[in-house]
């Protein structure tokens, strides 16, 4: 077991660390903003007037992306359902609304492309350091498992990770079952596992699963976006996370 030090906080008897992907290891702001804008435009082309409300729901305002907004933290299925709800408000039936939303997300995905965004500065070094210390490491993301696997492959992270877990069907964050399943897959107890993420959902999930601790990351110095964290850092201070 290892002691993890992050800023002035120490976590003792740690066996594993789970990382979120978007906004934690991956600087995905530009990708997510472009994706949300494309989805909104495609749906607005079919249902005029719905584009702007959808952008607001996604957490997009011009060039600003809210890291706590829907497109930043929700799973693919949650995003489809949220978009469909806005469509259904116009009087369309639920299944028609869901079909329009799913098609828009699929086509927007193809338009924007699946190439992962760059790693945040310091992310690779942290993974390397913690791996050398003998810790089990994994990604636990609200993105699909395929997106997680593509991210790991493109950035050549497989040597450092023992788990690549996304959300395909079933529960999403902040349901603690995701954290518990990840710990089970790694063969570690939740009480010996840290969660590193950039959303309240990450913190709630880990706390409800009785994790050893929660490390919150914020792009813009908004500690309320990671409420519940034991310690808060920003991406450029990633090097503060050491075994």
Task: Provide a role label for each language-model segment.
Residues 13, 159-163, 190-194:
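Short acidic capping loops at alpha-helix termini that bridge into adjacent secondary structure
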Residues 52-108, 124-129:
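A metal-dependent, Asp-based hydrolase signature
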Residues 73, 77, 111-139, 146-149, ...:
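Short, acidic loop-to-helix structural element flanking the phosphoryl-transfer center
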Residues 174-200:
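Conserved Lys-Pro-Asp/Glu-containing loop-to-beta segment of HAD-superfamily phosphomonoesterases
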Residues 239-243:
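Conserved small/polar residues in nucleotide/adenosyl-binding loops
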